[in-house]
Amino acid sequence: MINNRWIIVFDWETDSPNPDTCNPVELAAIPIDPRTLEIKEDRSFYSVIKPPGITKETYFTEERQKTIEWHAKQRGVESSDIIKSWKAGKSEKMAWKSFCDYCKKFNSEKSPGNWYTEPIPAGYNIIGFDLPICSRLAEKHKTKMPFSKVNKMDVMDLMFYWFENLDEPSSFRLDTMRKFFGIQAAQAHEAYSDTVDTAKLLVQFLRFHRRQAKVDKFKGAFKDK
């Protein structure tokens, strides 16, 4: 059952908090070698995306304006800087197809017992937020999902497994986890920075799990119980 499929940690930044209606504005991804657990920053992906309609006044709904202000506050810039950056981004279709091509580079070969070749998606709250966006874009732009549909590694769920019976940390937000573990964020809520920090958390716990996981610890553990 040894995993030989690449793990792709990824993160969307968007123009609203609703995964069903938002427009992506940033996408970052970074691969993790499945055997060494090395974070391959030199093989990362990053794209700023121009949301459809941003050149029109009707784009700037109250919700989007609040989201733009939030992004600006997180990065210590003006709202106009955020808008300028988004306007200079790639089209959504181009960014998504580039990302799909990027993920294909990490497909594995089929072998006995390994019928799923796509990389394993990983990230923070990807089940509730990022993966639904991927599904929506795949349907919209008529592509396949670039990830495995079977396995997924949501680090927020992983944190819940470990800390659900402890007083700390105070929440399961990524910012809270950064502070708790002493991770110095280069730029919180920027897609690439969030991706790198999530990858660090995932790798740390995977290494810990591997040190603990032995066949003889588990095999037959429920026998005669």
Regions inferred by a protein language model and the residue ranges of each:
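Active-site flanking residues adjacent to catalytic metal/cofactor-binding acidic residues
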Residues: 10, 124, 153-156, 193
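Acidic, Mg2+-coordinating catalytic module of metal-dependent nucleases/exonucleases
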Residues: 118-127, 132-133, 137, 167-225
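Substrate-recognition/cap helix-loop segment adjacent to the acidic, metal-dependent catalytic center
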Residues: 129-153
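Short, polar/flexible loop-turn hinges at active-site or ligand-entry regions and domain interfaces
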Residues: 80-87, 142-147, 183-187
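Conserved non-catalytic scaffold segment of RNase H-like nuclease domains
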Residues: 3-8, 13-124, 189
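Short, glycine/acidic-enriched loop or turn micro-motifs at the edges of active sites
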Residues: 14-16, 36, 157-160, 197
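Short alpha-helix plus adjacent loop in nuclease-associated cores
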Residues: 153-168
